[in-house]
């Protein structure tokens, strides 16, 4: 890609701080990679003195690959990495930090899920709520101590959130692990209190480039400011209009703070959108101009032609869903964007019932291992119990799969004693439950002596797990063939294992060949996210947050209503402005067509169109 005049000036910037205000589709990645190339080849900067920081591992890999291709190289000493990777590298070098010291995302997920079981929480979109809670925990840990007490969670009721948060911190402490927020604090304290270590890293990286700087938290910025002294060769690229991660501690004000910290910084505004048509850019600009706490940008489209933005109002959610279903049947690459994870549950259900495949999340197949599927986890729980483990979480997973009419009240302890459970049932004269419990115990004894293939078959046929799946699918109005296919593939994958322990170990670490990979991770509490496992769909369903950084030929924003977007818990000026930025991000994902849908009625409740629709 040839550079335009402003891009060229930014790329040629040499020493001293620089801020690149990069509007949507303005070629920010191109600017970063070309500047790295220019520093090395034109300015003769040693390549191992350059650090490029991104916010995701995928972005770091993509940027490095683009640089290597542009420079016609197979390897480079330039460091491309996330904040996470940089902080880990500093702590590893100074304190002997190990990867095993960092809590895994899966372990965080499992911990919160266990807390749900302990507190008897039952929500429909369990995966979405767990994800939100983990994000909010990170948000709270990034706040100053004086603000933590007044924090009001949006993921769940405050008392539950406080309980989970306290248990989470205790769990990390007793497990001798840290999360990303702990790593940031440790890195900050290390560099602030150890001048010789700070000096070492200041000399190591004399040129620092940061992508998506608007997403940086205050503590990340403080660390960066220490690292770039005294040379101040810091080159940030960001767009305060796309700052949408307030729940993680980011704020658009970090761009303003950069200007205050480096008052003599050069400012380059990339104001040409090479992605979207003129109609999309103009509509999005009208929207975002309603925000006051921002850098002004005179945005324009490289392609000023294009179809008008379409705004539709439907009588009901059902009518909206029917319209979308008919529209996406033309197989045109499309993204359906929602405000929350649960926002598209009914749409997914409808598409599933009508045989329309779709992808969830980042616009691509998720690539999740089939053994992450909740069905595989159910089988795993049966195997754990058959091997003599008595973890409450495993028992609660399968106690009513199939239904045994046994309440969780009989399993109060973390490690379950079957004899104690039977005693409680006897004290309550629950003969039917005693019979069902004895039947389960007998089934577990039988399974314990079987190889995995036979054990899975026994669980499916003798225990009645297949019957449970059929019943579940009838209740949810879902085609059972997909779930039966998962069970068949799980069972087939177990042929080469002789013991339950071998199979469990394989499930735990995912060491399995690619032919048993499955495209999606389903939540039992939510709906399956794709109705086929073979075809690659042109229909992508994801939240506005997860659409950031992506682009689509056609974008459909659904449920653009007050109380949904802006979210009903967004009250303050700052919160409303962040909601508007989120809507702006959603709009600017569209390359050619943008359709914005509102409904008059949802779940028998009357709704108003979003104020954002009126501002466009």
What are these regions (language model features)?
Residues 601-616:
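Helicase C-terminal subdomain and adjacent C-terminal extension
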Residues 79-89, 209-212, 237, 340, ...:
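Conserved helicase core region in the C-terminal RecA-like lobe
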Residues 20, 24-32, 36, 263-266, ...:
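Helicase P-loop NTPase motor core
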Residues 14, 75-77, 95-181, 205:
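ATP-hydrolysis module of ASCE/P-loop NTPase motor domains
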Residues 2-12, 16-21, 51, 79, ...:
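Conserved helicase NTPase motor core
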Residues 425-546, 567, 595, 613:
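Accessory C-terminal helicase-associated subdomains
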Residues 1-98, 199, 282-285, 588:
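P-loop NTPase Walker
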Residues 330-452:
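ATPase/helicase motor core of nucleic-acid motors
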């Amino acid at each position: 890609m040839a550079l335009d005049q402003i891009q060229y000036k930014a790329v040629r910037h040499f020493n001293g701080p620089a801020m690149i205000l990069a509007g949507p589709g303005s070629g920010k990645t191109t600017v970063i990679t070309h500047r790295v190339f220019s520093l090395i080849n034109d300015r003769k900067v040693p390549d191992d003195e350059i650090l490029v920081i991104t916010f995701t591992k995928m972005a770091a890999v993509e940027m490095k690959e683009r640089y290597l291709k542009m420079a016609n190289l197979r390897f480079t000493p330039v460091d491309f990495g996330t904040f996470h990777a940089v902080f880990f590298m500093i702590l590893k070098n100074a304190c002997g930090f190990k990867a095993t010291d960092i809590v895994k995302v899966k372990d965080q997920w499992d911990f919160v899920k266990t807390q749900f079981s302990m507190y008897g929480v039952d929500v429909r979109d369990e995966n979405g709520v767990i994800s939100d809670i983990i994000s909010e925990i990170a948000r709270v840990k990034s706040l100053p101590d004086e603000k933590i007490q007044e924090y009001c969670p949006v993921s769940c009721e405050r008392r539950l959130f406080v309980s989970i948060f306290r248990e989470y911190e205790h769990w990390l402490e007793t497990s001798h692990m840290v999360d990303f927020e702990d790593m940031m604090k440790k890195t900050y304290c290390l560099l602030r209190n150890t001048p010789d270590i700070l000096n070492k890293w200041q000399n190591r990286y004399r040129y620092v480039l940061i992508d998506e700087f608007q997403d940086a938290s205050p503590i990340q910025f403080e660390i960066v400011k220490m690292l770039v002294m005294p040379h101040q060769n810091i080159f940030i690229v960001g767009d305060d209009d796309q700052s949408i991660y307030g729940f993680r501690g980011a704020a658009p004000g970090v761009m303003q703070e950069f200007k205050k910290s480096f008052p003599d910084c050069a400012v380059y505004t990339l104001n040409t959108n090479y992605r979207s048509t003129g109609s999309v850019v103009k509509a999005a600009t009208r929207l975002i101009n309603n925000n006051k706490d921002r850098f002004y940008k005179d945005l324009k489209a490289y392609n000023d032609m294009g179809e008008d933005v379409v705004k539709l109002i439907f009588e009901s959610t059902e009518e909206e869903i029917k319209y979308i279903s008919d529209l996406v049947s033309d197989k045109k690459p499309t993204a359906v964007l929602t405000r929350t994870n649960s926002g598209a549950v009914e749409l997914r259900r409808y598409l599933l019932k009508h045989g329309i495949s779709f992808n969830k999340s980042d616009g691509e197949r998720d690539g999740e291992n089939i053994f992450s599927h909740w069905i595989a986890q159910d089988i795993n729980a049966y195997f754990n119990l058959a091997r003599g483990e008595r973890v409450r979480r495993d028992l609660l997973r399968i106690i009513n799969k199939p239904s045994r009419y046994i309440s969780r009240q009989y399993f109060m302890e973390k490690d379950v004693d079957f004899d104690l459970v039977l005693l409680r049932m006897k004290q309550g004269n629950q003969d039917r439950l005693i019979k069902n419990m004895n039947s389960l115990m007998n089934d577990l004894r039988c399974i314990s002596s079987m190889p995995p293939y036979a054990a899975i078959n026994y669980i499916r046929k003798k225990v009645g797990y297949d019957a449970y799946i059929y019943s579940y699918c009838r209740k949810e109005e879902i085609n059972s063939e997909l779930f039966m296919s998962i069970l068949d593939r799980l069972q087939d994958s177990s042929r080469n294992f002789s013991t339950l322990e071998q199979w469990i170990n394989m499930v735990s670490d995912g060491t399995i060949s690619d032919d048993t990979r499955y495209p999606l991770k389903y939540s039992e509490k939510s709906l399956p996210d794709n109705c086929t496992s073979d075809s690659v769909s042109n229909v992508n369903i994801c939240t506005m947050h997860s659409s950031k950084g992506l682009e689509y030929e056609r974008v459909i924003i659904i449920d653009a209503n007050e109380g949904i977007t802006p979210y009903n818990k967004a009250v303050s000026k700052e919160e409303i402005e962040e909601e508007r930025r989120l809507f702006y991000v959603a709009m600017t994902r569209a390359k050619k067509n943008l359709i914005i849908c509102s409904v008059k009625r949802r779940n028998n409740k009357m709704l108003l169109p979003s104020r954002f629709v009126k501002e466009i």
